A protein has these predicted regions:
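Long, K/E/R/D-enriched contiguous segments that form extended
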Residues: 1-92, 106, 260, 266
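Structural motif
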Residues: 39-41, 78-80, 100, 125, ...
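Hydrophobic transmembrane alpha-helix bundles
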Residues: 33-34, 72-80, 109-122, 267-276
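Catalytic binding pocket for nucleotide-activated donors in carbohydrate/polymer assembly enzymes
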Residues: 96-97, 104-235, 239-249, 253-269
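Low-complexity, compositionally biased segments
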Residues: 5, 119, 134, 213, ...
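Intrinsically disordered, polybasic Lys/Arg-rich low-complexity tracts
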Residues: 271-328
Length: 328
């Protein structure tokens, strides 16, 4: 499972992933019997409501999946899946299942990222540029346990100063040219001229410049996956190296390098027990019964007083009878 799960944005370069899938699809179409490591490409993301190009890229991924997944010449060796409504619950299922973690943003554009850390902790091997937290992952696991490709930040800045011309890269790479023209011609009956035009004329995030190196990294990842023992070791190295992203390590760095404070040993005292908090014995429970009895007696007192009051009301009648006898 080759997984790219994150917010959809041009700088995160889902379009670069799509170009590689198209190139592999065209290669298999031309030679259906060639040796090829089967791979399922999984996308999961959301686009901002007003981000037109991001929504078009989602539409392109969906259209491409219908073409590739239903082509009998491919024989299921490439599958493209787009998971809708990406959220934490979906990530909880996708990240443990991932074999390859696509972290392919243009160098110098990603602040850090945390998805790459979660995938690393779940044993996925990072395939990415030296951007954001990929740099720390690379430092933690070493060259042999990660697939790094693409321009570095100083090289990106230098190319921007000189003036980046995407058409130059396109016409110097026949595979890339064919993939871009595939998009330009429309996919599954839908037009994607906006995407192909942007790639050929602007390509702000240099997907075409990194395409050839990205393809090499994809081939290396396929070779590594075929060696099950090697791939398992790479996965374990990523899991064991993920400790650098723990909150404990981060807070310790703050304490040492920014706050300049020393750790304080905190000795937790056992909670003091009191008689009130201790469980009551049978003898302690007896007074409680007496108190309830008194309450019952007090409630019964008003009823007795009510009975005594009844003869007092009858007294005037007796005096009335006596007066009648005297009058006779």
């Amino acid at each position: 499972f080759d997984v790219q799960v994150k917010r959809l944005h041009e700088y995160k370069r889902q379009q670069l992933n799509v170009l590689n899938i198209i190139a592999e699809y065209q290669m298999l179409k031309a030679n259906p019997n060639m040796e090829f490591q089967p791979r399922t490409y999984i996308f999961a993301s959301k686009a901002a409501p007003g981000y037109f190009m991001a929504k078009k890229i989602i539409e392109l991924i969906d259209a491409l999946s219908k073409v590739v997944n239903n082509d009998p010449d491919i024989k299921g060796r490439i599958k493209v899946v787009f998971m809708e409504d990406y959220n934490v619950s979906l990530a909880e299922m996708l990240m443990p299942a991932a074999d390859i973690s696509e972290q392919i943003s243009l160098a110098g554009t990603e602040a850090s990222g945390t998805g790459n850390m979660k995938l690393m902790l779940n044993g996925a091997i990072t395939l990415g540029t030296l951007d954001g937290a990929n740099v720390e992952i690379h430092d933690a696991v070493g060259d042999d346990n990660i697939f790094i490709f693409g321009l570095k930040t100083p090289e990106v800045m230098e190319l921007q100063k000189k003036g980046y011309n995407p058409m130059e890269y396109m016409y110097n790479n026949e595979t890339l040219k064919s993939a871009v023209e595939f998009i330009q011609a429309g996919v599954n009956g839908k037009s994607f001229g906006e995407i192909s035009s942007s790639l050929m004329n602007v390509d702000q995030y240099m997907a075409l410049a990194d395409f050839a190196d990205y393809q090499k990294a994809q081939k290396l990842s396929a070779q590594a996956y075929q060696d099950k023992e090697r791939f398992a070791k790479m996965s374990l190295m990523n899991i064991s190296g993920a400790g650098i992203f723990s909150a404990d390590r981060s807070i310790m760095d703050y304490a040492n390098n920014i706050w300049h404070t020393q750790p304080v040993k905190f000795k937790e005292e056992a909670p003091k027990t009191s008689k009130k908090s201790a469980p009551m014995t049978k003898e302690e429970k007896k007074p409680a019964k007496k108190s309830t009895a008194k309450k019952v007696e007090k409630k019964a007192e008003p009823k007795k007083e009510a009975k005594k009051e009844t003869p007092k009301k009858a007294e005037p009648k007796k005096s009335a009878k006596k007066t009648t006898k005297k009058s006779k």
